[in-house]
Every structure is written in C-alpha cells, then in structure tokens.
Amino acid sequence: MPIITLPDGSQRQFDNPVSVLEVAQSIGSGLAKATIAGRVNGERRDACDMINDDSTLEIITAKDEDGLEIIRHSCAHLLGHAIKQLFPDVKMAIGPTIENGFYYDVDLDRSLTQEDLDTLEKRMSELAKTNYDVVKQRVTWQEARDTFEKRGEPYKMAILDENIAKDDHPALYHHQEYIDMCRGPHVPNMRFCHHFKLMKVAGAYWRGDSKNKMLQRIYGTAWADKKQLNGYLTRLEEAAKRDHRKIGKALDLYHMQEEAPGMVFWHNDGWTVFRELETFVRTKLKEYDYQEVKGPFMMDRVLWEKTGHWQNYGDLMFTTQSENREYAIKPMNCPGHVQIFNQGLKSYRDLPIRMAEFGSCHRNEPSGSLHGLMRVRGFTQDDAHIFCTEDQIESEVTSCIRMVYDIYGTFGFTDIAVKLSTRPEKRIGADEMWDRAEQGLANALKHNALEYEIQEGEGAFYGPKIEFALRDCLDREWQCGTIQLDFALPGRLNASYVAEDNDRRTPVMIHRAILGSIERFIGIITEEYAGFFPAWLAPVQAVVMNITDSQAEYVQKVVKQLSDAGLRVKADLRNEKVGFKVREHTLRRVPYMLVCGDKEIAEGKVSVRTRRGTDLGTYDVEDFIEILKQQVRGRELKLLGEG
C-alpha cells in the first residue's frame, strides 16, 4: 500500500502498486491529460512506471524543463519511426537530446538532401497526428539483442554489447511497428510531439572516432507548442542576421584564412575595437589595484611538466624544438605569473598581489570545432592571478565578483548565470585541498547572495572554478568569466612568502578572467549589438560629409576639430549625392553622420544624423564634440535620440 507524497506535502494512499499516470488521474483528469512523466524520489520515470513503495512524486508536464527535454527525446524516436518507413534499409545509431532539440545518427547508403528532410518532416507530422500511444517494454539483455539482430540494427547491437550489462533489463519503446531502445523516459502518447522542425544534416563518426564509419546526423528542434517553435525559429533567423562572421566581413573588422586556421587577421577597424576593449579593462585594473605584466609566450617543457599541463593538457598544446630542448607555446598565462611572483622575497604584508596580463595564448583545438571568433586557436586572455593567504580568499573572490559585474554591466549584460564547477576525475592535488577550494568559492558566492548552479566534475584539473555565463538578446548563454582557486600550482612551482611567524608558506592562487578570450568577446558583442557598437567602441565614431565641393574645406576643418578632441572621425568628400553617402555609412554602422552644406557653414554648425535614421538637427561643432566626448567617457550604450 504505497503512500505517495506530493510536492505540496499532501499524501495519497493506494491499496496496490500504482503508476505515475494513475496518481495523476487520482488528482484530476486535466493533470492526467497533461502528464508526460514523473519524478519519483527525484528520479525521472515514465508515466506507465509502477510505484511499489512509499515515495515522493512530482508530475512532469510540458511546462517543465524536464518535460520539454522528454518531448525532444521522443521526437528523436519519431524521426527514427519516419525514416524507417521512408528508407527501410537505414541503420539507426543514437538519437539523444541536445540544447533546443535532438539529433539522430543514421547509416544510409545515400546522402540526405534538403528535399529528403522536408519529406521526413512531413512523415513525422503525419505519424504524430495519429496520436498513437508509446508502449514501454522491459526485456532481458538477450531479448533486446535478438530483437535488434532480427531487425538488422548493428549499431543497437553494438550498444548492447559494449554499454549494457548482460544482467540488465533494457527498455524498448514501441512506436507502432518501430522499436527503439532507451533509458527514457518518453512521452506516453505522440499528442505531445506536434511542434518540431528538422534543421540540417551533417557528418558524424560512429562513437566520435574518425577511424569508424561516417554516419549522417539529422538535427531537429522540438517545442511544447507552436508559439515556442515559431519563437525559436524567429530567433534563429535573427541570429543568422547577427552572425559575427557575416558582420565582421561587412564592417571589414577581420578575416581568417586556411593558411592560419583558428588565427585572426585583425583589420584596422577590428583592431580599433580590440584596443578599446583593452583600454577599458586597463582602467578597471587600475581601479581594482592590479599590476599589469607581460610573460613569454613559449617556455621549456620542464616547466609545463612541473605544472601538470604537459600531462593533463598536452593534446591541446603547440610544441616546438630548438637546440635539443622542447618548448610549448603557452595555452594559459598562470605558470608565467608564478615565475614573476617568485622573483624576490615576498612577505605576508605584500599580499594580496594582483597580477594581470593581456596574454597571447594558443590551444590546438580540433579543426572541426573552430568557429569564427567564438572558437579559435590563437587568442588573447584578459587574465589575472591573485596571490593571497587563505584568510584573504573570500574578500579577494568577492572583489573579483564585483569587478565581473561592473565590467559586464558596462556592455549592457545584466542577465548572468553563475555556475560552480567542482573537481574533475582527472586532477592534481589531494582531496583535502579540493574540499577547501570548493568551500572557499561557495562561501564567496553565498556572501554575495548569488544563486548558482553546481556543475559536478567540470572544474579544471588544478582547481574548482566559478563560471559566469552571459545571456544575450537572443536568449543564448555565453560562458566568459571565470574565478578559479588553485592550491596546487604555486606549490608545484615553489612559490612562497614569509608568514607572520617567519615561516615560509605557499600562497593561494586565484585565476581570474572576465572577458575571457578578447577575440570571442568581440564576437559576442558583435552579435549582441548586431554590429551597432556603442559610440565609445565604434571603429569610426563620426563621418563628416559635404553636399558639394564648395564645402570641402569646411568639412576638413570640422574633421580636424573632432580628431584633435580625440575622436575617431573620417571625411567623405566623394562626388556622390549626400543621400548615397548617408546610406553607405549607415550600412557601415557609423554612429553619427555630420552633413555640411552652405547653411551649416554660414552658421558654423553641422547637421547631425544617426545610423538609425534619426535627424537630430543642427549643432554647434564644439557642442557636438562635447556631447560625443561625454558619451565616450561615460561608455554610454545609446546614441543621441535613442532614449
């Protein structure tokens, strides 16, 4: 007679074992109709699963995050159902959920086209609209293998052979004549799976190993209702318009080429944005009492072995040899900063020492993962390392957190997800050290009243970390900032200070990055602003243009005034209509266009327009200069006339 405890604390007693769905039915028909699955004692279970003992139960519906993930997983099975009907010889591999959707890897003797995707999507819709029940069946390992051997599914048999114990009882899910194997849970009926779209096909090796056969990966998205689906597709369209690679080319910011994969060729305008970011961060370094240093970008293998990077990070390091010595190009700045700390005797009175660097780092990322500025091999980190005592950890981490929010707020990012990443399986240092490090970060987060998510096993090999992920205007998350405690590296590199009792102690090291990779951050803000950089960041802040040749001299005079005031300005004296010039510079996202005609010359003024098409009227040149300088000094996000 199980007693079921519901989320509100109420209890229901049943005479016999009861299914998740039956409990929902006992509460109400509306809830039963909405039930996708249940969370029994915290574990997700199918709606048909029986509850034999006293348990807690939460009903999962399409309104829950778990419910949406289950819908997506079931849509992957629906795709399998459809492709098996249209291409009976296809061999099914794996079909998991991913962010915003799902995919299925299939082995088919022909390449799928967009037309095939359209046909598949249509068949999926036809099947889903029949609202058939999904039937779950627990079988023995041998029964499952016999089932897939009979159905000619070698990949399913391989999963059973390699991943599932022979004494296990895997679950088979029956979609009419189609059978798939999965941990589940899945929807009880296909009425929940009406809102999806197949997105693209890509290649994927079986098991992710290039030695194995290349399969075709069909990507799809799925949502709880039509409004959510349409909203997502609209966001994708907007994201395509904001793609930093497209905007970067249109604005002549940078380029990349095959001879230097994952490396950026910065053009003048892109490098201007880069340097403005550096300048801004430098002002904050001064405000938060950091010293700026510069270390070598290549060091001997011996040092990297001491730090543990060679053993734990070697696959991602570029190496070279000279005079019978092996060197590694640095993938991160921390070992170099310890070398600087080690020069000269340090006292506890000297701590904390906050050491920052715009460090040029290189990582040998897989070529398939490279993506514009977002994933590169050569990048610049706004990196810092704080050497402190254990007693100073919380105050220093708190200062880092304050700096993170200060800088992100300047760019308009206020929705920030905070995550605490704990010890990974592959790590250095004793468990006691990890206990102290993880607790220190957790205490600082609690002290700052920050809600955070724990990411088990996602820390670096030398310490746990706090991650800050920015949520942009398209509701995407970008992980940028990190604060990382490290009790191991200073000791490995013999860093020490003289404590108050005159004993030598090893300092705690806090790794801190805010923008992360500056290249990646430029990619993020390019998409966030759609290339409409605020005036302080814009490569060109104003263009001064004439109407006829008679105003050319006045234009040059105005340009000199703005340039002498420290503003980035260009003249456009081409023999083109002023409307043509305005349109061209609008497409280049120049914040302000200053038009000089005979009337403006007579009054000593300029006519001001913004890139958004707002006519701001005429301004005295000096007045406009002061207004623009104020926008730049204040790092304001909006232009004149934008509220």
Curated annotation (Swiss-Prot):
Residues 1-61 form the TGS domain. PANTHER family: THREONINE--TRNA LIGASE, CHLOROPLASTIC_MITOCHONDRIAL 2, THREONINE-TRNA LIGASE. Residues 243-534 are annotated as: Catalytic. Its cofactor is Zn(2+). Transmembrane segments: none annotated. It comes from the Bacteria. It is an enzyme of class 6 (ligase). Its main location: cytoplasm. Zn(2+) binds at residues 334, 385, 511. SUPFAM superfamilies: Class II aaRS ABD-related, Class II aaRS and biotin synthetases, TGS-like, ThrRS/AlaRS common domain. This is Threonine--tRNA ligase. GO terms for molecular function: ATP binding; metal ion binding; threonine-tRNA ligase activity; tRNA binding. The keyword Nucleotide-binding applies. It catalyses: tRNA(Thr) + L-threonine + ATP = L-threonyl-tRNA(Thr) + AMP + diphosphate + H(+). GO terms for biological process: threonyl-tRNA aminoacylation. It comes from Actinobacillus succinogenes (strain ATCC 55618 / DSM 22257 / CCUG 43843 / 130Z). Binds 1 zinc ion per subunit. Keywords: Aminoacyl-tRNA synthetase, ATP-binding, Cytoplasm, Ligase, Metal-binding, Nucleotide-binding, Protein biosynthesis, RNA-binding, tRNA-binding, Zinc. Pfam families: HGTP_anticodon, TGS, tRNA-synt_2b, tRNA_SAD. It is found in: Cytoplasm. Belongs to the class-II aminoacyl-tRNA synthetase family. Homodimer. One of its GO terms (cellular component) is cytosol. Catalyzes the attachment of threonine to tRNA(Thr) in a two-step reaction: L-threonine is first activated by ATP to form Thr-AMP and then transferred to the acceptor end of tRNA(Thr). Also edits incorrectly charged L-seryl-tRNA(Thr). Its EC number is 6.1.1.3.
